[in-house]
């Protein structure tokens, strides 16, 4: 699973996921299913935001990579992926500027057009069950919830899906592709079932035990099949800016 994640997702996504797990004392090499889940969630958050801007009239528009957008404002503020201190700093700034109610839990995005925080969910289960779990945890009508599944289903607060059909279809297609590729490699069952995941972890750890006197060889090649999974959705200019913003070392 770890190799699949590193080859499947954008390097920035992988780096952010590793950073988030280490912040909570978790090891991506051991908790590989969680590693995959975090990367998937991060990618959906970025895909949700990418190419969506607000023009000078305050209208939401879609601008593909390469088009001039210097005078446009990004519609969504990405909160997910930041360390907790920086995330709350961003939230406090948004609340002070817009006057919106401060959430009790860290949301994933802020929508400058609708003036609301958004909680994104990606589930391997039934969307309505996961939606209710999110709603019961957040206990706030101010935070908008949008749930996606790997089967193409989705559910959102008051059936308000925020994005246009094409943008949501892009996310659903990506999730379905991840599921299919996991399944073709025998990874999907362990990703869905905790019991199967534990069995797979024991198997992986046993396979990782080095034989006495045997040299360890690591391959950095990407298989042709996995090359088709490499995400092409990120705006290169914004990727560089986000990397600098999200991954910079805190000042001592």
Swiss-Prot record:
The GO molecular function terms of this record are: RNA binding
Kindly give the Gene3D superfamilies that the UniProt entry links to this protein: Influenza RNA-dependent RNA polymerase subunit PA, endonuclease domain
Superkingdom of the source? Viruses
What are the GO BP annotations of this UniProt entry? viral RNA genome replication; viral translational frameshifting
Pfam families xrefs? Flu_PA
Check the record and name the InterPro entries matching this protein: PA/PA-X, PA/PA-X_sf
Where exactly is the site Important for efficient shutoff activity? 202-203, 206
**Keyword line:** Decay of host mRNAs by virus, Eukaryotic host gene expression shutoff by virus, Host cytoplasm, Host gene expression shutoff by virus, Host mRNA suppression by virus, Host nucleus, Host-virus interaction
Q: Where is this site: Important for efficient shutoff activity and nuclear localization?
A: 195, 198-199
Q: Does the keyword Cell membrane apply?
A: no
Family membership noted in the UniProt record: Belongs to the influenza viruses PA-X family.
What information about domains appears in the record's comments?
The probable endonuclease active site in the N-terminus and the basic amino acid cluster in the C-terminus are important for the shutoff activity. The C-terminus acts as a nuclear localization signal. The C-terminus is recruited to host protein complexes involved in nuclear Pol II RNA processing.
What is known about what this protein does? Plays a major role in the shutoff of the host protein expression by cleaving mRNAs probably via an endonuclease activity. This host shutoff allows the virus to escape from the host antiviral response. Hijacks host RNA splicing machinery to selectively target host RNAs containing introns for destruction. This may explain the preferential degradation of RNAs that have undergone co- or post-transcriptional processing.
Entry protein name: Protein PA-X
Task: Give me the gene this protein comes from.
Answer: PA
